[in-house]
Regions:
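Ligand-site clamp/hinge motif
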Residues: 102, 208, 238-284, 415
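A bilobed periplasmic-binding-protein/Venus flytrap-type ligand-binding module shared by bacterial periplasmic
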Residues: 68-69, 234-239, 297-321, 325, ...
Length: 551
């Protein structure tokens, strides 16, 4: 439980941070949420701050062609129609997908969402010759859809997306491409003085301005953005999906990266909802009538190992030893039960689990035996360095968790050094890879990962095509077997084929242990009893449009 002195200090800090809020923002029409991010995620279409950005700026402000079903929490979230009502791979060309668009959907500025708008939005991240090309949005986008190569208008309500190779996973991938209003952006671009510079300079300025005047087609509209302080969203009463017209008039999003500060904000009723409460504060939070929501998520909290020459993790005995030395059940207890033990990317019961030969469990004696075989001992420990963050999307409680791992691995002849940086910086460095100067002296990185589908959960960590900066194979791990199996997954265009291919890839991945498999998050959040209608899906995301707030 939080000590009273710490809580009092946090309360004072929070009261100061919230002094800019008006009394009206505490009424029943306004939902106030404290995020783990240190800044407001980008609002210009392609969010940063990991999937907390998609959760709080992408999904509320925008729509995608294909979206996640966040309406229930009894089973894993699947994809459902968004701006596209249907899609299929071209039977004559498996590198071409056809999407039929939903009729009569309008952006917040009243203009239509049509095929031209979709092509324009693909151009913002792919077409270097287009005025709207936004290099600053590429890193948050293309690593999540690396095979996408272009878009073609077939007619006003039909668009084709092309890929560099057959890719059965594209519908999952494009849940990350949020569609902004071309007309709104072009008006801003036209107003940028030519004296600003060339097309690229004017475009950059236009996107900067657009961030505070964002226009999408989502259930919420942007009212006010104050970087590092707050984002105010307002209800889109004309939203096309009547089941998702928001129940509250406004949402105020506040960045509060420190868990104790978030807890203090909740207990002092400065906010209605906090992400990732501190585990030692959960009993105190519950005792004051707040509710803890949690559910299984397609999430992995790992250490991702470097496979560069000179990295100690190239020795599979070392990789296996680290995985066998960690008591995940004890860590779960330490976190108040708010995690699931990771024995792979996918657990028993998941159709993509397969049948790994190597069993990840707590077996410190075998771990020490492996380390001894590898040449290490209590008097000659292995020095390893992991990079992590103090907070961030999906990072759970990164500092206490890494400190626990540090102490645990010490008993198996590991000497762990922890390097801490700001979340967005760590996330950027993750995409740059282990060869980048930012990774100097680091041989493992702790970045939580969404594992919604076989690309996100496996392919982007196990193939040469996913080497940085294309995707997030930070450690440059690959084997001929994972390459072959990843190709089979991409060519699996039926559910049965996908389950078989993905299961075989997962078994191979676990057997090669490119990660320290630690935990799966359950996404705990603490919410005021005045807030109702919360659906905690089995997802990284949540639908704010379903939420109500009473007096």
């Amino acid at each position: 439980m939080l000590k009273s002195s710490s809580l009092n200090k946090c309360c004072l800090a929070v009261i100061g941070a919230f002094s800019l809020f008006s009394a009206a923002q505490a009424d029943a029409s306004t939902l106030r949420i404290a995020m783990t991010a240190a800044d407001i995620p980008l609002t210009l279409g392609q969010p940063d701050q990991g999937y907390e950005g998609n959760r709080f700026t992408g999904i509320p402000l925008y729509d995608a062609l294909v979206e996640w079903d966040l309406s229930q929490g009894e089973k894993p979230s699947g994809v459902v129609p968004g701006l596209a009502t249907e899609w299929h791979v071209d039977p004559q060309n498996q590198r071409r997908w056809i999407f039929k668009l939903r009729p009569d959907v309008k952006f917040h500025d009243g203009t239509l969402v049509n095929a031209d708008a979709i092509v324009w939005n693909v151009g913002k991240v792919l077409d270097k010759a287009a005025p709207q090309y936004a290099p600053g949005q590429i890193g948050n986008t293309l690593s999540r859809m690396p095979t996408l190569t272009g878009a073609e208008k077939i007619d006003d309500s039909t668009v084709a997306l092309t890929t560099s190779e057959p890719d059965a996973l594209l519908p999952y991938n494009i849940t990350n491409l949020f569609i902004v209003s071309p007309t709104a952006w072009e008006k801003i671009y036209a107003a940028v003085p030519e004296s600003t510079g060339d097309t690229a300079a004017r475009s950059k300025q236009a996107w900067t301005t657009f961030a505070s005047q964002a226009v999408g087609s989502g259930p919420f509209k942007l009212e006010k953005l104050v970087p590092r302080q707050q984002l105010i969203l307002t209800k889109n009463a004309d939203y096309w999906n009547k089941d998702r017209v928001p129940k509250v008039d406004k949402v105020v999003l506040i960045p509060l990266p420190e868990a104790n500060a978030r807890t203090a904000a909740l207990l002092s009723k400065q906010v209605d909802w906090i992400e990732a409460p501190a585990p030692d504060a959960v009993d105190q939070i519950k005792s004051q009538g707040f509710k803890i929501y949690a559910n299984t998520q397609p999430h992995l909290w790992p250490w991702q190992f470097s496979f560069l020459e000179g990295s100690p993790w190239k020795d599979i005995r070392v990789r296996k030893a680290a995985n066998l030395c960690l008591n995940r059940a004890e860590l779960k207890s330490y976190l108040g039960g708010y995690m699931t033990e990771a024995t792979g990317v996918y657990e028993e019961g998941n159709p993509w689990r397969g049948k790994p030969t190597f069993q990840i469990k707590y077996d410190p004696d075998t771990a020490r035996k492996l380390m001894t075989e590898a040449g290490y001992s209590e008097s000659k420990p292995l020095q390893v360095t992991v990079a992590t963050s103090a907070s961030g999307s999906g990072q759970m409680q990164p500092l206490p968790m890494n400190e626990y791992i540090q102490q645990s691995l010490k008993s198996c002849f590991f000497n762990v050094d922890i390097k801490v940086t700001e979340w967005n910086t760590l996330f950027t460095n993750w995409r740059l890879g282990a060869k980048d100067p930012a990774a100097a002296g680091i041989n493992a990185i702790n970045v939580s990962a969404a594992v919604n589908d076989p690309y996100f959960g496996m392919i982007r960590f196990a193939t040469e095509k996913a080497f940085p900066p294309t995707a997030t194979n930070w450690g440059f791990f690959t084997t001929p077997e994972t390459e072959k199996l990843a190709t089979a997954v991409k060519h699996a265009f039926t559910p049965a084929e996908m389950d078989k291919a993905a299961g075989e890839l997962h078994a191979a991945l676990v057997d090669q242990v490119p990660f320290l498999f630690v935990a799966h998050d359950v996404g705990p959040r603490a919410i005021s009893p005045a807030v109702t209608g919360v659906v905690q899906p089995q997802s990284w995301f949540i639908d704010l449009s379903l939420v109500s707030k009473k007096e």
